[in-house]
Amino acid sequence: MGYSAFMNGLDTTNGGLAAEPLIRLGVFAAVLALLVAWELLAPRRQPTVGRWRRWPGNVGVVVIDTVLVRILFPTAAVGLALVAEANGWGVLNVVAVPDLLAIFTAIVLLDLIIYAQHMLLHAVPLLWRLHRMHHADLEIDVTTGIRFHPVEILLSMVIKLGAVVVLGAPALGVMIFEVLLNATSMFNHSNVRLPVGVDRWLRRILVTPDMHRVHHSIVARETNSNFGFNLLWWDRLFGTYRDQPAAGHEAMTIGLPQFRDPSELRLDRMLIQPLRSNRTEGRK
């Protein structure tokens, strides 16, 4: 009954679909505020670059990303899920699956697709040129979790929309996944200190800040590990899991060998990074 009520509320004929971005925005703002406060009260690392240098570019690019997505994909993934359901598109709309199982399956499989996409962004040179802007941040905190090049965001959206149609993902499952992905991306990029026991317990299921920080190391073998954003299982299953950085969390260097100058943190410089030479990057 709860699922049916939600679906009726999202029905495009009564304008209920407009509530979905408001829900996402509310959760985004709440999680962002909580994590910023946590970073100030209990930081994991002492920043080597001031927030005043990094945050304007990081926040500026997410504003651009958001505007572009809303203009080019006005109904977003939840709206497409409703269209797919109405037309019987996708596996979960063809195979008789209980609602809750369909929602759970969609969330897990969408997370696997994000993991696979992330690996491709590192493995394919042209895609890496887009993704490396995310890794060029000289520190890692909650704003790094929303720092993605606009072209990468649009490409990710196309992949996500294709996955929603092929899977026949329920609208509620897509909405939950979108909210979780935004929240966990900010969480696992945040500069927060967790007790060792809590981190170890969370790592049974989720990607923690310490785990994902390894992925932002300047050391190539560490950069090419820990690709998960939400569920830990994929890194363990596919052999890409790395427990800790060799230099330790406090001493490790964040970022890439290229783009070390603080001027590269400006928004205009960030946006043209995919066009820049990678000869000095040293990833191989």
Predicted region positions:
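A membrane-cytosol interface segment of integral membrane proteins
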Residues: 249-284
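Membrane-helix interface motif
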Residues: 2-7, 74-86
